Swiss-Prot record:
Organism: Saccharomyces cerevisiae (strain ATCC 204508 / S288c) (Baker's yeast)
Gene name per UniProt: BUD32
Keywords attached to this entry: Activator, ATP-binding, Chromosome, Cytoplasm, Hydrolase, Kinase, Nucleotide-binding, Nucleus, Phosphoprotein, Serine/threonine-protein kinase, Telomere, Transcription, Transcription regulation, Transferase, tRNA processing
GO molecular function: ATP binding; ATP hydrolysis activity; protein serine kinase activity; protein serine/threonine kinase activity
Name of this protein: EKC/KEOPS complex subunit BUD32
Role, per record: Component of the EKC/KEOPS complex that is required for the formation of a threonylcarbamoyl group on adenosine at position 37 (t(6)A37) in tRNAs that read codons beginning with adenine. The complex is probably involved in the transfer of the threonylcarbamoyl moiety of threonylcarbamoyl-AMP (TC-AMP) to the N6 group of A37. BUD32 has ATPase activity in the context of the EKC/KEOPS complex and likely plays a supporting role to the catalytic subunit KAE1. The EKC/KEOPS complex also promotes both telomere uncapping and telomere elongation.
Miscellaneous: Present with 3020 molecules/cell in log phase SD medium.
Family the UniProt entry places it in: Belongs to the protein kinase superfamily. BUD32 family.
GO cellular component, one term: cytoplasm
Quaternary structure note: Component of the EKC/KEOPS complex composed of at least BUD32, CGI121, GON7, KAE1 and PCC1; the whole complex dimerizes.
Organismal lineage: Eukaryota, Fungi, Dikarya, Ascomycota, Saccharomycotina
EC number: 3.6.-.-, 2.7.11.1
GO BP terms in the entry: cellular bud site selection; maintenance of translational fidelity; positive regulation of transcription by RNA polymerase II; telomere maintenance; telomere maintenance via recombination; tRNA threonylcarbamoyladenosine metabolic process; tRNA threonylcarbamoyladenosine modification
Amino acid sequence: MTQEFIDKVSSYLTPDVDIAPISQGAEAIVFTTTTHPYLPRAKDSHQKYIIKYRPPKRYRHPQIDQALTKHRTLNESRLLAKLYLIPGLCVPQLIACDPYNGFIWLEFLGEDLPGGHGFSNLKNFLWMHDQDPYSDLVATTLRKVGRQIGLLHWNDYCHGDLTSSNIVLVRDGARWTPHLIDFGLGSVSNLVEDKGVDLYVLERAILSTHSKHAEKYNAWIMEGFEEVYREQGAKGAKKLKEVTKRFEEVRLRGRKRSMLG
């Protein structure tokens, strides 16, 4: 990402808004800022926010590109606003949305992990605990991750890109609270296929980065997930059976694709 591009983004926001890039994906670029879109900046404030920006795609017709950017930015913003209201579900708070220019302003979550282990997403957290992978802290955190996914799915929402990098951990004393982030591919869906795919994507992400301990890690995640459904009584047990059955089918299809190359 060039300084010229950053300056161009800054010109959309006005020079008063400081930005620092932290990640770049296929659809969006994520910046941090210390500037709130509406509130005056407090002196000596260390408060940070996230700005997610969908840049124009030159390969698309400008009118089509503008329409897609507006639709996707609004869709993600509306989804986050609804998810934030679900009791027990942890997602970043939506602060502002500019769909015409492709900007979303969000609450900043997480921190740097001790010992130079990077930002506090689930992937880095598990790497940090690689010397003690089966500790109570790791098990508890992964079950909490499963509960977050369970709450998301029980309320008929799907993430669409559920990797260990899209789960941010927020410190709560000696413990950590998982938050689901980046709902650019999120959707409202009661389809067991979509839920099964979500679970499979996370399972594969854990397997690819923490292969030695992946079986136990994924089992703990599923314990938390299943707990949410079982708390809903007979209806929850029935739906859980449907989701886990489809998850197994999705997993089987994935294995067949791997074997065939």
